[in-house]
């Protein structure tokens, strides 16, 4: 997180807490990882009936997912001149998953100095 390197922003984090972190960072869009579980949450921090949408985007993991999907992943974030904090749908977040040779990657881990459990994590998607 912007506050601490060992703080996890899990998907079901309390909305008030997530908004506080984003407001302290002065972030309308915050992209982060660390949990290896991709998600996109749209939060409204507006007051007095005025919308102010903020986007919390966990980009997941390119090659070590922890969501039981063994494929690699990345995010395409689309922002353009019409994007606005007043319109929650004016920012597009697309999660892309792709196949790669997981067994080859796992074997490379096993042949390295890394713990073999990392290879199993690749095979299981955790």
Regions found by a protein language model. Name each.
Residues 1-29, 44-45:
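Conserved catalytic scaffold of divalent metal-dependent phosphoesterases
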Residues 2-4, 36-39, 63-64:
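Short, catalytically relevant binding-site loops at active-site mouths
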Residues 28-38, 56-60:
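Active-site neighborhood of phospho(di)ester-bond hydrolases with catalytic His/Asp-centered motifs
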Residues 42-126:
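Acidic, His/Gly-rich catalytic cores of divalent-metal-dependent hydrolytic chemistry
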């Amino acid at each position: 997180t912007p506050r601490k390197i060992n703080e996890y922003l899990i998907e079901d984090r309390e909305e008030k807490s997530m908004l506080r972190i984003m407001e302290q960072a002065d972030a309308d869009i915050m992209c982060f990882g660390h949990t290896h579980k991709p998600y996109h949450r749209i939060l409204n921090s507006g007051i007095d009936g005025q919308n102010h949408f903020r986007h919390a985007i966990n980009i997941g993991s390119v090659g070590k997912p922890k969501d039981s999907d063994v494929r690699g992943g990345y995010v395409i974030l689309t922002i353009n001149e019409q994007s606005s904090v007043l319109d929650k749908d004016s920012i597009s977040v697309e999660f892309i998953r792709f196949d790669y040779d997981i067994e080859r990657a796992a074997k490379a881990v096993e042949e390295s100095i890394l713990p073999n459990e990392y290879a199993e994590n690749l095979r299981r998607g955790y």
